[in-house]
Amino acid sequence: MQSWSETAVPSVPGQGPPLRLFDTADRQVRPVTPGRTATMYVCGITPYDATHLGHAATYLTFDLVNRIWRDAGHDVHYVQNVTDVDDPLFERANRDGEDWVVLGMRETALFREDMEALRVLPPRDYIGAVESIGEVIEMVEKFVASGAAYVVDDPEFPDVYFRADATEQFGYESGYDRATMDTFFAERGGDPDRPGKQNPLDALVWRAARPGEPSWPSPFGPGRPGWHIECSAIALNRIGSGFDVQGGGSDLIFPHHEYSAAHAESATGDRRFARHYVHTGMIGLDGEKMSKSRGNLVFVSKLRGEGVDPAAIRLGLLSGHYRQDRPWTEQVLADAHTRLQLWKDAAALESAQSATDTIARLRQHLADDLDTPKALDALDGWARRALDNGGSDTNAPTEFAAAVDALLGVRLRRP
């Protein structure tokens, strides 16, 4: 699948401290220590609707990780999937009387436009679930052969399920107790009451063909992949086991990331799918989580269509810490516009005080678990001092603009 176009990233003299991120599995902030090539997998969209601000906040978070690694001199192998074969896509297509393939292609194209407008650096591998079906089938065959998965006793719909106890370490990624797992499994796409399952938490890895649904041939009969195994297969076949960061929203901690890890670990025998599990908070509107079911989504494309500067959207979402649930309000957007203009005015000066210390603070705050509130405050301080007091360093405004562009993805000057 085609990704979106990459924007140029300026180089900035110097280097920041090593990146530290909160790891969901270990419940602590700890160093991320990639090799020469840093590796990251971030779960992508199910393309049945436009990109809302909750999506955007997640992809902006991991764009910062990408930029910090690049700033440190790493090559970055970033993989993102598109869940272009799944129940929500079929349900929306049926509701609207539209072909599910056409719907998925249109919304994926709109997502790419939104990411490009927000200046999110594209993944090296952008993979649709449909493209990975052969890889999923190979994994499911391995599970069935090893006893990690079984076919339910249902002649009409012989689905294949992965045993939740197939790995000893199941549950380490989320740290949830059984009651919490049961609740989230039922609420987030699981089917605990499916007749024939041996454990309510066993996860679907191959769904036998149903009338009106697409299907592909397999040794277990025609069908299509389950949700979690798609990400396991895509990641393992691009960046292998033990990659540096797996990312997504906090609503993916369980079941999605728990099962993606368990599937991969069962297939490889490794103890840990990713070295770091990193999750973003939810974006809310009027005190509620932004979600399709509540009908309170704010879409990036709609804001762009209203003439909102994508850089202001980006700054508004970066104004809060990525791990916190936080609101989106008109005031957040207004403050972002004000901040953007402040920085642009400072970057347009012919000279100012040195920006070296401020750039060092920017790097330091971002390396400290992506502390964007402190990073943005440091940049505000330099910009105000530059505008109020001037300075004799003719390189400072250019260096300031380059650092903001490279590390935060916000362009202050026309190319």
UniProtKB/Swiss-Prot annotation:
Sequence motif: 'KMSKS' region, positions: 289-293
Region (Disordered): 1-20
Amino-acid positions noted as binding L-cysteinyl-5'-AMP in the UniProt annotation, renumbered to this chain: 43-46, 58, 81-83, 227, 249-251, 283
GO cellular component: cytosol
Keywords, sorted A to Z: ATP-binding, Ligase, Metal-binding, Nucleotide-binding, Zinc
Catalytic reaction list: 1D-myo-inositol 2-amino-2-deoxy-alpha-D-glucopyranoside + L-cysteine + ATP = 1D-myo-inositol 2-(L-cysteinylamino)-2-deoxy-alpha-D-glucopyranoside + AMP + diphosphate + H(+)
Cofactor remark: Binds 1 zinc ion per subunit.
A single MF term (Gene Ontology): cysteine-glucosaminylinositol ligase activity
GO biological process: cysteinyl-tRNA aminoacylation; mycothiol biosynthetic process
UniProt short sequence motif 'ERGGDP' region, positions renumbered to this chain: 187-192
Keyword Magnesium part of the UniProt annotation: no
Keyword Metal-binding attached: yes
InterPro entries linked: Cys-tRNA/MSH_ligase, Mycothiol_ligase_MshC, Rossmann-like_a/b/a_fold, tRNA-synt_1_cat_dom
Leading EC class: ligase
Cofactor(s) listed: Zn(2+)
PANTHER family, per database record: CYSTEINE--TRNA LIGASE, CYTOPLASMIC, CYSTEINYL-TRNA SYNTHETASE
Subunit structure: Monomer.
Function comment: Catalyzes the ATP-dependent condensation of GlcN-Ins and L-cysteine to form L-Cys-GlcN-Ins.
Family: Belongs to the class-I aminoacyl-tRNA synthetase family. MshC subfamily.
Name the record gives this protein: L-cysteine:1D-myo-inositol 2-amino-2-deoxy-alpha-D-glucopyranoside ligase
Organism in which the protein naturally occurs: Rhodococcus opacus (strain B4)
Name of the gene encoding the protein in the UniProt record: mshC
